[in-house]
Amino acid sequence: MEEMSPDNIHGVILAVSSSIFIGSSFIIKKKGLKKAGVSGARAGEGGYGYLYEPWWWAGMITMIVGEIANFAAYAFAPAILVTPLGALSIIFSAVLAHFILEEKLHMFGILGCVLCVVGSTTIVLHAPHEQGIESVKQVWHLATEPGFLAYSAVVLVVVLALIFYYEPRYGKTHMIVYVGICSLMGSLTVMSVKAVAIAIKLTFSGMNQFKYFHAWIFIIVVTICCILQINYLNKALDNFNTAVISPVYYVMFTTFTILASMIMFKDWASQSGLQIATELCGFVTILSGTFLLHKTKDMGNSTSLRGSTSHSPRDTPVFINSGSSRSSNSTRPAIL
């Protein structure tokens, strides 16, 4: 295990702070979506009534604060270090959902969260140091190499297929559609965010990077990707259980982001086989935790559902493949 550099330490502190804010924002935003769904069309049905709900905006502000901290973290540390710390937002979100939204988290779900943290910690302790980048043009060169251009093209094709073919047909019954869109676009967002963060960092150090058009192209990419992510994340939150959206979104987002970072920044080029293997083991541990959360998803809800007839069918979590559990929603008021 290598000693962490000062930049990596700064990145970790910012990433942890970001996870706390973002984890809270999931819960606050969902409260807003619940309130908006009572009086109008739900976000999952194409409604935008949540834009008039103060709770939703409070959640957005909380998320923005978290994203700013996350944004700053990418200026100091590699994506393979910053991104896995999103596991902390899973735990914070799941615990708050248990107490505030009454989306019950079983003891095996708690174990799944612990595994996510252990895996993330393993990755952090063996993460590579940030490579020296002295200009946004250097990042642009990395982004326009054939490998990353091919990755970006594949992402765009898959996202367009999900939006125009799969989302209208399977969006409300298969969480993977919404989460897939957010995760794939998120990997491009992170690469562009890192470029912009580096440009800002270098500009504050006296080397203005915004005189180059490359920086502005990265800003445009970030804006477009963020708008898409917010829209489809709202639909996911409105249709499915928060305690499971968070870990599944985290795993998919982290997987694609690490893959994108490997291709673009070649994070593992300077590491030994043992270090890479240890990081992969950490990631497998995270996947195991998420699998455990998914497989035990109904345990925390079955008792309360049997004991009460006042719950809406929408209180029962619906996950990646759940085509038969939404049919009753069209015959009753839209209440989360």
UniProtKB/Swiss-Prot annotation:
Signal peptide positions (record): none
UniProt subcellular location: Cell membrane; Early endosome
InterPro entries, alphabetized: Mg_trans_NIPA
Residue numbers spanned by region Disordered: 303-336
Ranges of compositional bias, category Low complexity: 321-330
Membrane-traversing stretches: 8-28, 56-76, 80-100, 105-125, 146-166, 180-200, 213-233, 245-265, 273-293
Membrane topology, Cytoplasmic segments: 29-55, 101-104, 167-179, 234-244, 294-336
Membrane topology: Multi-pass membrane protein
GO annotation, cellular component aspect: early endosome; plasma membrane
Keywords, in A-Z order: Cell membrane, Endosome, Ion transport, Magnesium, Membrane, Transmembrane, Transmembrane helix, Transport
GO-annotated biological processes: magnesium ion transport
Domain of life: Eukaryota
Positions in the Extracellular compartment: 1-7, 77-79, 126-145, 201-212, 266-272
GO molecular function terms attached to this record: magnesium ion transmembrane transporter activity
Family indicated by similarity: Belongs to the NIPA (TC 2.A.7) family.
Job of this protein: Acts as a Mg(2+) transporter. Can also transport other divalent cations such as Fe(2+), Sr(2+), Ba(2+), Mn(2+) and Co(2+) but to a much less extent than Mg(2+).
Subunit (UniProt): Homodimer.
Identification of the protein by name: Probable magnesium transporter NIPA2
Species assigned in the record: Arabidopsis thaliana (Mouse-ear cress)
